[in-house]
Amino acid sequence: MPVTDLASEYDENQDDWKMIRDVLKGAKAIREGGTRYLPQLSGMSWGEYEAYKKRAQFFNASARTLNGLVGMIFRKEPEIILGDAESLRPQLETCTVDNQPFTVFARAIVREILSMGRVGALVDAPTNGGQPYFTTYTAESITNWRNVRNDAGKIIANQIVLKEVFLVDSDTGFGSEEVTVYRELFLTDSNSYAQRLWMPVKNRNNTVGYQPSDIVVPVISGAGAFYGEMPFICFGPMKTGMAVQRSPILDIAELNVLHFQRSAQLAHGQFYTATPTYWAIPPNTGDIPEYQVGPNTVWLVDQPNSCGILEYRGEGLRYLESACSQLENQMAGLGARLVADRKNTAGESSQVAEMRSKGESSLLYEIVDSAENGLTDLLKIWVRWNGRNPRNVEVKLNRDFVDAAMEYRTWLQLDRAHAQGNIDDETYYRTLFEGEMLPASYTHQDVKNLI
């Protein structure tokens, strides 16, 4: 099997991943997708199809939903607990392969989980030594893997293939060009973690093959090699692991494409029916006169000939308009609450509103749990690679998805109780923090410093 082979689960899901990516990119990507997203009507020429496609409106409910969900989770900064490795905190400001802070890395991971339902992250370090760093791999970059049951009876991955794109100097001497390589992570016969790159080479028949480089066995500072595990975490919306899980917004993306198709049909119908058609019966002389249309123009027609205007009358377009509205409401029901028409929500009771959002909140809680577990495992690996004890290392994401600041009256009662000594400093400041009475930039560590 060549290194370019795809896992069966990858092959089954890549069409869905492609659709979600294009939907999130917006109208341009959807239109460039052509008949993949908008079938060409029978008998329609290429020029007519291009006009048909351009008239369609793309209402990106999927991207709005995604941005809203990410914003709900990250309306408060993640809490990063390093325990005995607190001295490593400054290094978290530039801990990724592109020198981004850990909070930005965590946000990108959660965004990929919400959008694609799959993302991987690798802890790696320069071969000549240096600080370890995090590298993110999208769902499309995790091309193959092999799961086995280890001696402890647990299912683990003992081989993972990752597709990467390197920039190399152009043959012309100007700029750069992209080269696809494959990074293989695997466990050796001695159960130690190793990796190697597969670089492209041209074969005699002018096709591209791949040749492996030397095997590299990463070493942890003061602890030797990794044994029985790989410093790679694959995230999903329900749990971590190599199995492909369904994207949380797949249903919304599919409805988004269907809405685009209905919009194209509606605009197509409006284009041909909105403008009236003028008609006139020419005289019997055989000459065909030219008629100008305008407010200052009068047509003189000999009897018994006549003229008139043809205008569209019917319910067909109303059905298409109704279909578009129904799809928007369905997207709203699946989680795209930013798309929903809120004009009737003023009289809605809090119990009904809570019931409407309960399903979405439950999904967000599961996603936050999964992301937290994976980010915590990654951070522990990073701390170990830095030669420190990962005990008590933890990442905590926000679970307060709704803006619910403490009321002024409640704050007065809390402040009075604190002044009278009825509650201690820790309870006072932490309640202020959780009630959003402290600046949004504050973290749990800032609260501890106040105490």
Segments and roles (model prediction):
Residues M1-Y137, S141:
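Extended, helix-rich architectural segments
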Residues E93-P101, A108-E112, K239-R246, L250-A253, ...:
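Generic amphipathic alpha-helical segments used as scaffolds and interaction surfaces in large
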Residues L114-P237:
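Extended, regular secondary-structure scaffolds
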Residues D287, P295, L300, Y319, ...:
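C-terminal helix-loop subdomains that flank or include functional centers
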